[in-house]
Amino acid sequence: MAIERTFSIIKPNAVAKNVIGSIFSRFEAAGFKIVGTKMLHLTVEQARGFYAEHEGRPFFDGLVEFMTSGPIVVSVLEGENAVQRHRDLLGATNPANALAGTLRADYADSFTENGTHGSDSVESAAREIAFFFAEGEVCPRTR
C-alpha cells in the first residue's frame, strides 16, 4: 500500500471537551504519524473559504458559525492508505450512524458538531493541507 497524507480537524466541541491528547493517542495507536499540527481559531473568512464547496446549502451558515465558535486543531497524518483509514477511525459523518469505538461515536454532539473532520480523497487532503500549512510546516518523519 502507498504511504499517503491526510488532513484532520479536531473541531471546537471536541477541543472544548479536552480530548485532544486522547484523539492524538488514537491516531498514533492506529499507526498514523502526526507530521504537522497546530491550534487556531478560525475567522469567518477562513471558515467560509475552507467550506466554500458547501456555500448555498442550508447548513452552511450554521457550519461557519460552529467552526468559528472556538479553537480547532488541524493536523496532517501520514500512513499507509491514510485517507480511508482515517475516515474509518472517524466514523460516519452523522454520529447517530457512527460505529461504537469511532471518534464520532465517542466525541460528537450532533450532525454539525460531530467532533472531527477528515479528508475524503487524496486530492482533497492535498488541498486542505495547503489551506492551513505553509511550505516547511509539515515535517517528514523518517525515524
Curated annotation (Swiss-Prot):
Q: How does it assemble?
A: Homotetramer.
Please state which protein family the record places this protein in.
Belongs to the NDK family.
Q: Where would you say this protein principally sits, based on its record?
A: cytoplasm
Q: Which PANTHER family match?
A: NUCLEOSIDE DIPHOSPHATE KINASE (PTHR46161), NUCLEOSIDE DIPHOSPHATE KINASE DDB_G0292928-RELATED (PTHR46161:SF3)
According to UniProt, the name of this protein is: Nucleoside diphosphate kinase
Keywords of this entry: ATP-binding, Cytoplasm, Kinase, Magnesium, Metal-binding, Nucleotide metabolism, Nucleotide-binding, Phosphoprotein, Transferase
NCBIfam families, per database record: PRK00668.1 (NF001908)
Function per UniProt: Major role in the synthesis of nucleoside triphosphates other than ATP. The ATP gamma phosphate is transferred to the NDP beta phosphate via a ping-pong mechanism, using a phosphorylated active-site intermediate.
Q: Where is the active site?
A: 117
> Which SMART domains does its entry note?
NDK
* GO MF annotations, alphabetized: ATP binding; metal ion binding; nucleoside diphosphate kinase activity
The Gene Ontology biological process terms listed for this entry are:
CTP biosynthetic process; GTP biosynthetic process; UTP biosynthetic process
Q: Which reaction does it catalyse?
A: a 2'-deoxyribonucleoside 5'-diphosphate + ATP = a 2'-deoxyribonucleoside 5'-triphosphate + ADP; a ribonucleoside 5'-diphosphate + ATP = a ribonucleoside 5'-triphosphate + ADP
Kindly give the Pfam families that the UniProt entry links to this protein.
NDK (PF00334)
Q: Return the EC number.
A: 2.7.4.6
HAMAP family xref list: NDP_kinase
Q: Where in the cell is it found?
A: Cytoplasm
Q: Which GO terms describe its cellular component?
A: cytoplasm
Cofactor(s), by name: Mg(2+)
Signal peptide start and end residues: none
User: Which residues hold ATP?
Assistant: 11, 59, 87, 93, 104, 114
Tell me which CDD domains the record gives: NDPk_I (cd04413)
